Amino acid sequence: MYRKILLTLALTVGFAATALAQEVTIGLTMGTTGPGASLGIHYRNAFQLMPKTIGGYPVKFIMLEDKTDATEAAKNGRELITQDKVDAFMGSVAVPSTTQLAQIANELKTPLMALSPVALPPDKLDWTFVVPQSTTLMMSAVVDDMKKKGVKTVGYIGFSDSWGDLVLKAVEEKAEPAGIKIVTNERYARADTSVTGQVLKVIAADPDAVVVGGSGTGGALPHIGLVERGYRKQIYHNHGTVNREFIKVGGKSVEGAIAPTGPLIVPEELPVDNPVKKVALDFTTRYEQTFGPGSRNAFAGYSYDGFLLLDAAVPIAAKTAKPGTPEFRQALRDALENVKNVIGTHGVYNMTPKDHNGLDERARVLVRVDDGEWKLLK
């Protein structure tokens, strides 16, 4: 059994002057193994860079491994809430896992910072706050680029799970009004090692462009297959593929791939007046100092932005309740629902009771693989 790793960032020695202060406990369930490992490792790494306090209170992180498995993630979520009595929890690396966590957040009335872009009805997100950009927001940038380039038909190949469904739905929603017809809907499992059959069907349809609805290294598989079989038109991805591992696996085959992502991938290329530039540049600099040049990625930024949202909400909640109590969890949820102008690495968050994501078009850019690096598409 995978047992918890305690990340007690607020050590007693460091807080002698605040010994009487209540400690805030944040639970984490991450898939650093399994098919989502190339994402989960980055989600986890971000916690080495977190401040030692949250909203002025000592903070303790309790991390559990879920192996990119929805059932395991659900079990971890329950354990963190019922046994560890966390004040809030964060996770996980895949939409199926995070969907399970959202249900548990509602049931056990504990705020969840969703690290995958789940798309559920508002009543299902009552206790969930979605950190990543919505799939619709991101894929609309892709459709805009296709329209600009005169694309009339597009092939789709994506995961055979809720993430693949989300990406397809977002493309469908924007493509039809733009006069773009989706001519294939091919699927593959996250753990598949070959997509030859699906790729051949896409090539047979001869679309003007292809959208891949995968994530992480799994998103490279159909791209490689398409290029190997002679497809030379534009291949688009989604914000689940923008990391170094995707390029390592894809090599020269993924040169020219276009994907939407958050500004933190290219902070140096952002205008000086971009509100996200300073925070994104600071985080990517510290991340690469710790984990090596070129290690920047969107997923560590989601963890950090989740922390920043909690950091803004904790002092508000603490005015009416003490950490470690049901009353504090309720107050924290209510505070999160109303945070304004929280500048993260991905965008500026403005939550409302009807919008538990709070991001706008400032939270997206298009990037392209150019000489083995993700660079801003200009």
Positions of PLM-derived features:
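N-terminal signal peptide c-region/cleavage motif recognized by signal peptidases
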Residues: 14-18
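Extracytosolic ligand-binding ectodomains
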Residues: 2-11, 21-378
